Amino acid sequence: MSRFETQFATLNAKNEGAFVPFVTLCDPTFDRSFEIICTLVDNGADALELGFPFSDPLLDGPVIQAANNRALTAGHSSEDSFKLLEKVRSKYPEIPISLLLCANLIFAKGLDAFYQRCAEVGVDAVLVADIPLLAKEDYVQAAKKHGIQPVFICPPNADEKTIQGVAKNSEGYTYLVSRAGVTSAENQAHAANLDTLVEQLKAHNAPPILQGFGIAQPAQVKEALALGAAGAISGSATVKIIERNLDNHEQCLAELAEFVQTMKAATK
């Protein structure tokens, strides 16, 4: 069983949902980022979704774009992100780790080399945000060759064919987008048809569904679980805490700890 499967099975047995925070690797620096990620795990994160700093992110709203820029300004490369992942994995052998990336980042290194490096540092799953199902083949093949689980996004406007494709090709978990647009903690609305999408994904035996985009409050975690999702992903709200505490690292870690504890409590 993969780390994601093991974690979902453990949570199911306890009748709990998953809380998964997202941060950008090396934001604001390599060392601080490591401490931030440790704080997330130590305070109850069930899995991690992590991004590589990239100058032209597609789905990212202003908060996560700023995080990318901070890491890039600090001079951090994709190889630094891999080294940081290696450090996280050696400290936390069990935590499921997923990467959320743009295709260009993978392409720059070469598909095979990228997924091989993911396997070497202990990544479990990779979601390529801007690869449609129709263009998935090379990515899926490279991922599977190296034992990495490919994850796909189910958008709120997905038709039956897309839902079927996402369910069939995703491994580890399924990323259900709450609404159209870019990531943001401000826009906390979600599409009206999410419960139907969850039902349809489950009917096609999709892996456990994690709902993301606009998840900033414990009530939204409860809502995601009530809709039938297995858990919720929170990116912008997590990264915002880093952004507003750049001059006070201790305060940053304290606020992150409290945020994760509250969000995790909502899954029980």
Swiss-Prot record:
The active site is at E49 (proton acceptor), D60 (proton acceptor). Its EC number is 4.2.1.20. Belongs to the TrpA family. One of its GO terms (cellular component) is cytosol. Pathway: Amino-acid biosynthesis; L-tryptophan biosynthesis; L-tryptophan from chorismate: step 5/5. This is Tryptophan synthase alpha chain. Keywords: Amino-acid biosynthesis, Aromatic amino acid biosynthesis, Lyase, Tryptophan biosynthesis. InterPro entries: Aldolase_TIM (IPR013785), RibuloseP-bd_barrel (IPR011060), Trp_synthase_alpha_AS (IPR018204), Trp_synthase_suA (IPR002028). Signal peptide: none annotated. Tetramer of two alpha and two beta chains. It comes from the Bacteria. It is an enzyme of class 4 (lyase). One of its GO terms (molecular function) is tryptophan synthase activity. The alpha subunit is responsible for the aldol cleavage of indoleglycerol phosphate to indole and glyceraldehyde 3-phosphate. It catalyses: (1S,2R)-1-C-(indol-3-yl)glycerol 3-phosphate + L-serine = D-glyceraldehyde 3-phosphate + L-tryptophan + H2O. It comes from Haemophilus influenzae (strain PittEE). NCBIfam families: trpA (TIGR00262).
